[in-house]
């Protein structure tokens, strides 16, 4: 303001006359700053501002201005004292006009008195801003301060003036003094001009400060405070401050309904009303003397509080319905209260009974004491009942408190409602009980009232109250009449009144309780209503019972008895709160999923916010192979099976995900996924998937790498993914740390797949496995004939064979596998692994000691298939090297057996040794890591026969020729003609020529006639030449090595030799052993009934499907020997002569055989022949217990001999 020109300042000073009172106050504040600066303003401006005051004479004013303008130095030196006097005088004049800025100007003036004028101006403005910011505008109550105190600072100011003025060295000093005097006189004239008032100014100032502090504190209690309830009601702290300003501007002593004062006052009145409504009925009814001192004091104090409350209601703001507006205008408050509850509150607050007693006692004491005493007492008691009208006030306050609790705590609101309802019912019962006794008491207890009948007129008030309350509650609950039925007319009417009131209260209580219970569990009620609609829908469309049950189960698992509109609930929340809730709901999914555990938390949050919850039932196909993929899924709970066309099945459990491959390649589904249990999944759409991965390229790379690894595990490839991953690796987009994270995610995914395989293998293991010897019966063409032969009848002699011995064959269409696929069926493999490795051993399982088709045949199964690379951890190394006598042979291991046992200690060693090198000849890239190192030629040579052993001779060996000489070439796996991508189906490995095997020592006499004209088994590739990478040559023969007791197919089917038999395992009672002679006769019957094999049957056998290579199908083709040679024992047939099981017969296999039912070549005799070129099969035999007795090898019968 000091920098403004005088004309502009004059215009600003004239603004309060044109604007309202608020602008006047603001102008005074600004002018107060100038006055505190040292008195440089013209005193004539003060006359403009104080227009109601008589202005000084113009000559004096002109002299003042001239003196100030003539001597500026004297003004500066005298400025502090003069400014203190001026600001104090004018400031106090302004203060009682309603401006709080006068305090700041006074403080600034006093501060300026201690220093220069500029310092005083700075101190004044800072102090003024601090006071205004702390207290706001002045309350209207300050306008009522007595004006006589306005001259309070005048005496100190005038006293300070001579002290601050130097001796009369400057001529303008008297003019300055004369300039000061009119201002002071003017101020005194305004405030009354009394000289005596100057003597009491210091005490008045102290009183004013104390009263101002108390007034401010009490005024703050009348305003709404910044608490939880106020913030919830008004929305923000700024809104609460605006409401406080409304209270200040509304007038003097206006109480806000949400203020702290009103809160505590209502609480006090609530407790006082409850006490009155309980004590007053008891005192009126059961106590005759009401003029005792305690009773009078209680009534007087209560009436006084209620009268004060009546007055405060005129100054308390009224809340309009629905909290839309709060009325703070005093006139509107008064009119609204007078029209509503004023009459009731006034009557209940006035002590009418005491007023009546005072008036009556002054009329005539003698009359009062005699004739009118009883009537006056009765009327006084009736008038005292008017205090019970305070119940209306109690109901209003309780309702207000319910609103407060409802706005603050929802659960507390429900509890308060129930407590209020119960309390009101008990209060009505209390009143009704007092009424039941009050009516007979006012009638002076007539003879037919219930009090006289029961003889309780002179009893204690406690006993009278108890029976009266019992009678009232019996009426109100409609359960009786108390001790007896009413007799008098007054009792009858009272009983009817009690019944009506009680029935009303009972209905209200039931209704409120029901509504409260429903409100406490609204989600369950909503679910029940929804499911009723579903039941009506199913009935309307007449759905079958199975479908209805599935719908019921789905609703139970999906909603679990509670239904929420989760999308709308989350949509109404803020984004940070919504993300926090979603992260909490999906915490189990994140904890069980390695992908999220190794990912960026921002990526996890972005992914979770876009997930959608879904539930699938067992048997539901979540995705189907060949369809267009629009979603991927994350498993929270449940187990799913991943199925491909090659029957390659994989299990996925909690924490896994699937369906991301087609989202990455924008192609079609590569596999089908079926739910095995109830699955709770989270789905992610393709749009959201791409949106998230655009922000996190490293996670896209992780998804692509895991997808490639999964495709490789199921034997498929995707060039698009391979090209993307290879491009990222070559370009070096990701650093070392990111690549490590991606590799860790891939390793976790593999581990989860292996865990799922272990769970599946454990689940498929049964206590009594189905004999696998009967599996080919379903797949063979002569199924019906085999089922009716005596072989089946003979085998059914054993009581331990399961009923479901014929199992259905696997589905057709399994031969169309890609070049990179692993041709094996995990389900078939896992059903064989536990039975072969653990549960099929006769010694380890007592329930199977007498089963003819047990562990030894499972070893044959293990010898005829290859396992995918992911299954090597499933094969326990403890069962890979059994003792030599596991199948009846003496404990003298051969060198090749020891070599195989040593090699089988690794994860996949016993499978590789059993297959005899078929893995090494396969071109499948998936099996490359599983191939062991090169083996020595000695390991591929057949072992010599054990001197004391049975030699492993069985029934079938009597139909076979002796092994060929060393000139007979052996067959290599490559000469079977399979493509490079498929696994080799042959079981022989090693050099092209196999050393000559030793001769068999003996042949059983009862089968001697069946060996004539027999020739070795030979296999001829259809193409004539081997594929590239294999040694070409003419058709090779598989030499028939002498069978060992180690687990070859031949040894499994041959009867025991004449060597000393080992100790027999004791059989169960009532189970006769099967004799070899009977089995031999049954075998002759079957083998004689079968036709001969055609020559070109090898064309079909060479293209055996990958699935059939894992099955133990006993069908095979027999061909003439490629080259002649003298066998070491027994006569050989002529060259080129085909032979069957019986001389002169040809065993044929039908040409039209599906790939799913084709047996693998060498499934029986091939394994026997392979035993001469590979390690023994004892590595796949089950482990026996240390103390278990060995069981002799029983003959096993193939189904299509």
Swiss-Prot record:
Q: Name one GO molecular function term.
A: voltage-gated potassium channel activity
Please list the reactions this protein catalyses: K(+)(in) = K(+)(out); Na(+)(in) = Na(+)(out)
Tell me the residue ranges located in the Cytoplasmic compartment per UniProt.
1-263, 315-336, 400-413, 518-1201
| One GO term (biological process) | regulation of heart rate
Q: Which residues lie on this side of the membrane: Extracellular?
A: 287-293, 360-378, 437-464, 487-491
Biased composition of type Acidic residues is found at 26-36
> What regulation of activity is recorded for this protein?
Activated by cAMP, and to a lesser extent by cGMP and cCMP. cAMP binding causes a conformation change that leads to the assembly of an active tetramer and channel opening. Binding of cAMP removes a tonic inhibition conferred by cyclic nucleotide-binding domain (CNBD) on channel opening. Cyclic dinucleotides can modulate HCN4 channel; cyclic dinucleotides acting as potent antagonists of cAMP. Inhibited by extracellular Cs(+) ions. Auxiliary subunits can also regulate HCN4 channel.
Does Transmembrane show up as a keyword for this record?
yes
Question: What is recorded about the protein's domains?
Answer: Contains six transmembrane segments (S1-S6) and an intervening P-loop. The segment S4 is the voltage-sensor and is characterized by a series of positively charged amino acids at every third position, while the S5-S6 segments together with the P-loop form a centrally located pore of the channel. Contains a cyclic nucleotide-binding domain (CNBD) in their C-terminal region. The CNBD is connected to the pore forming transmembrane segment via the C-linker. Contains a unique pocket located in the cytosolic C-terminal domain, identified as a likely binding site for di-cyclic nucleotides.
State the residue spans of region: Disordered. Answer: 24-183, 804-902, 914-1201
Sorted keywords for this record are:
cAMP, cAMP-binding, Cell membrane, Glycoprotein, Ion channel, Ion transport, Ligand-gated ion channel, Membrane, Nucleotide-binding, Phosphoprotein, Potassium, Potassium channel, Potassium transport, Sodium, Sodium channel, Sodium transport, Transmembrane, Transmembrane helix, Transport, Voltage-gated channel
Subunit organization: Homotetramer. The potassium channel is composed of a homo- or heterotetrameric complex of pore-forming subunits. Interacts with PEX5L with a 4:4 HCN4:PEX5L stoichiometry; reduces the effects of cAMP on the voltage-dependence and rate of activation. Interacts with IRAG1; regulates HCN4 channel activity. Interacts with IRAG2; regulates HCN4 channel activity.
What the entry lists under Pfam families is as follows: cNMP_binding (PF00027), Ion_trans (PF00520), Ion_trans_N (PF08412)
Q: Where is the composition biased (Pro residues)?
A: 164-174, 881-894, 1029-1042
Tissues of expression? Detected in a subset of elongated cells in taste buds.
Where is composition skewed (Gly residues) in this entry? Answer: 105-118, 1122-1134
**Glycan-carrying positions:** 458
* Listed InterPro entries: cNMP-bd_CS, cNMP-bd_dom, cNMP-bd_dom_sf, Ion_trans_dom, Ion_trans_N, K/Na_HCN_channel, K_chnl_volt-dep_EAG/ELK/ERG, RmlC-like_jellyroll
| Positions of post-translational Phosphoserine modification | 139, 1105, 1108
Which residues does the record give as 3',5'-cyclic AMP binding sites?
A: 659-660, 662, 669-670, 673, 710
* Name of protein: Potassium/sodium hyperpolarization-activated cyclic nucleotide-gated channel 4
Q: Which residues bind 3',5'-cyclic GMP?
A: 559, 562, 564, 566
* Sequence segments annotated as region (Involved in subunit assembly): 209-260
Parts of the chain in the membrane but not crossing it: 465-486
Where along the chain is composition biased (Basic and acidic residues)?
121-132
